[in-house]
Amino acid sequence: MNRGPVVREGYVYIAAALFLAVVMYFGFGVAVAVPFVVLACYFTYFFRNPDGTVQDVVELEDDDFVKGPCTKIIIFLSVFNVHVNRSPIAGEIKCQKYVCGRFRPAYKDEVGFENERHMLGIENKKGFRVTVTQIAGILARRIVSWVTLDDNMSKGQVYGLIKFGSCTELVVPRNVEVLVKKGDKVRGGESVLGRIK
């Protein structure tokens, strides 16, 4: 679990950029070192803990895991957003599915069906089910997940990230009142996306 200001996957990028900055400073001077300092700052910003924009809210007739009528909330994460993923509810991972796919721009409507993706089906103690899917984009060519089947997650727990430009989809049953709409800005671990009616 990652509770720090930067997720652990980011430290290697930050450290590498700072190392190169030091090497360039002593080898070639300040002017050559500055771009690497800027790069380290960018990596710190990118891998911070967390945001995104609601790309769409779609009604579905059925979902393989949730079962029955449901609602899909699609959150687009640009290169400037945080690509850290958090569990929307406390529960056990009952289903996990990874699909190899394309790397189309994450804002395209068809990415949920065509792009590389990793889906988790989570069920709480009362039998309430949701699915959350990490979807890679044109720059995001690595989906990272630190959880697996049968793991228990707490609400808001960081469980993975998508590196550089992506989309996240959340599918909830129709008895959830969705509190966001297309175009809304959301922040991971803070914004409430829905409430059970």
Language model regions located:
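Contiguous, well-folded functional domains in the mature portion of proteins
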Residues: 1-197
